[in-house]
Amino acid sequence: EKFKPINMFKQLMLLGAAAQLGIFVTFLGALWLGFAPPEAGAIGIIGGADGPTAIFLSSKLANGVNMLADGTLVKNLIGPIAIAAYSYMALVPVIQPPVINLLTTKHERKIKMRPPRSVSRLEKQLFPIIGLLLTAFIAPSALPLLGMLFFGNLLKESTVTNRLANTASNALIDTITMLLGVTVGASTQADVFLTKDSILIFGLGAFSFIIATAGGVLVAKIMNWLSPKSNPINPMIGAAGVSAVPDSARVVQNMGLKNDPTNYLLMHAMAPNVSGVIGSAVAAGTLLSFLM
């Protein structure tokens, strides 16, 4: 069911890619502030709004163990990056609405989109397989992230592994979440977290979310201009390309209802929202392959 919105609105996958602009702009910003390239790459991924991806990339690039070309060690930024990523994911309902309002008109916010089409069982089962193969070619370094995402979806959609799907989506994920919280928390000692770098990381994280939201909205506006009048695109759904699932999609839904109580955009917004998860993992794999 996770990828059902993408199958309904395949053209909206582009918005999931557009919102990754925040990652690469923040990467350049971190370089400008004096961070080493691997550290800047790990900081940039905060804009992907995906906590596990941020932890994965920072543990590879900014782990305090890797050595730079000049012989110095990279800084251990796992704790500050993880906390910044999860903090701003929780603040999506605060960060995104002002950006959306700034970049869209009241008329655009009232645009109603076509209702979703039905998706066959075969489509649901083929999507994770094809998606895994394509992303394996594009960003093989991201396979630990994307492989688990697509595998979990396939467990659910196959309908023959219900026990495994239930375990993975309940007991297993709860256990892993607890372990993840404990291990990240243990890495945030005062000498690591209470530093000038942490302040810069939090500032860059906020900047990254704003740029990602703006990038998604602006590309959605362009898509709306290019779309036929019979199939318009509400520019607000571009903000859902920020892969905080499902918070970004809910922000778009609430703003749509606020401007028109009969305008339901949740399923439309979930398409770029879920594709943003894939996009952030591909971006992480790209950074990893260049910066390791």
Roles of regions detected by a PLM:
Residues 84-160:
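Membrane-embedded hairpin module used as a gating/binding unit in multi-pass transport
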Residues 131-220:
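Transmembrane helical segments that form the transport core of multi-pass membrane transport proteins
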